[in-house]
Amino acid sequence: MRTDGRNNRELRPVHIQPHYIKHAEGSVLIEIGDTRVICTATVEDKVPPFMRGGGKGWITAEYGMLPRATEQRNAREASKGKVSGRTMEIQRLIGRALRSVVELEQLGERTVWIDCDVIQADGGTRTASITGAYVALVLALSKLVAEGKLESLPVRDFLAATSVGIDPEHGVILDLNYSEDARAKVDMNVVMTGAGQFVEIQGTGEEASFSRAELEELLETAQLGIEQLITIQRRVLGEQAALIGEKVEQEGKSE
């Protein structure tokens, strides 16, 4: 039994509250255990200069933490005058992950800005950001469909992320909180689609190595968690969930 009473393959309690920010085209508050992240999606009718004239859209992300999202206060990066390497890595991860399940050509020359703001951190902030940002993105693009700006929802599959690790005492565990992450021999972030395809795997040993068998167990455990997260996403999105992949399926049948 883990310190918070969970079994090895159990997620922390997950809650996704949609339409959390009234001004954003899409927004959620995602809570996974004591980790809480506000995710918003903003649509701009333009693309970065390097994409102009190409007929494709773009999805990019920004990520940040409130100073007291953590146990000790961390100064805002704006006050330091630069973005940390960790923040840059997470921003790129979120953007890459979301672009993997969106038909950018169908989006047209629009940019969707994803903003993930961690208001309380207890492990898994980047994976919570991806899982919440996906819902915010679908809400924003669904609004464009409702307004007649898009013919159909340009999202071909679901997307979610979670963490797994190898605990010195408990072995392979799912959805690490901060204390578990700090003592894990191996920790890994996994991003997957609803079809069970991998989008990203980030795994490292901390003064330790791991075997192929352990890797397979880590990935299997992550997939179990991600399937549960996608079930929650479906429930939150309601009728909009049925539209995901619809255009892609129709095009496949017509070929």
From Swiss-Prot:
Belongs to the RNase PH family. It holds the Pfam family RNase_PH. Keywords: Nucleotidyltransferase, RNA-binding, rRNA processing, Transferase, tRNA processing, tRNA-binding. Phosphate binds at residues 86, 124-126. Phosphorolytic 3'-5' exoribonuclease that plays an important role in tRNA 3'-end maturation. Removes nucleotide residues following the 3'-CCA terminus of tRNAs; can also add nucleotides to the ends of RNA molecules by using nucleoside diphosphates as substrates, but this may not be physiologically important. Probably plays a role in initiation of 16S rRNA degradation (leading to ribosome degradation) during starvation. Its EC number is 2.7.7.56. Homohexameric ring arranged as a trimer of dimers. It comes from the Bacteria. The gene is rph. It catalyses: tRNA(n+1) + phosphate = tRNA(n) + a ribonucleoside 5'-diphosphate. One of its GO terms (biological process) is tRNA processing. NCBIfam families: RNasePH (TIGR01966). One of its GO terms (molecular function) is tRNA binding. Signal peptide: none annotated. This is Ribonuclease PH.
